[in-house]
């Protein structure tokens, strides 16, 4: 079982692989506007994509994010574009099959 589980970190990407299932978490800091997350894993099928924002302590503005790309785009281009309305760090979590 030990040989079936691996993990690694590349730049802002943390990747956990269990057999052919991969969870890739990408931390994207930045300002308001469209951001791009670079995906390191060559997914064959994406099961889930989620965004989690982290705001600065004391921030008064609501945080909102919207994903621009569908799963086919993410697989083909190994990137994900999303919009943020503020200056928060966003974690992108992609779960899929390789």
Model-found features: residue ranges?
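Extracellular attachment/recognition segments
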Residues: 15-98
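A signal for long, low-complexity, Ser/Thr/Asn-enriched, surface-exposed stalk/shaft
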Residues: 1-7, 11
């Amino acid at each position: 079982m030990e040989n079936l589980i691996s993990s690694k970190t590349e730049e802002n990407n943390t990747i956990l692989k269990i057999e052919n299932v991969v969870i890739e978490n990408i931390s994207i800091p930045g300002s308001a506007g469209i951001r791009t997350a670079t995906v390191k894993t060559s997914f064959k099928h994406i099961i889930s994509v989620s965004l989690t924002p982290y705001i600065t302590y004391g921030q008064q503005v609501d945080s909102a994010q919207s994903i621009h790309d569908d799963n086919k785009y993410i697989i083909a281009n190994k990137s994900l574009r999303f919009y943020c309305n503020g200056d928060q760090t966003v974690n992108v979590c992609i779960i899929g099959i390789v």
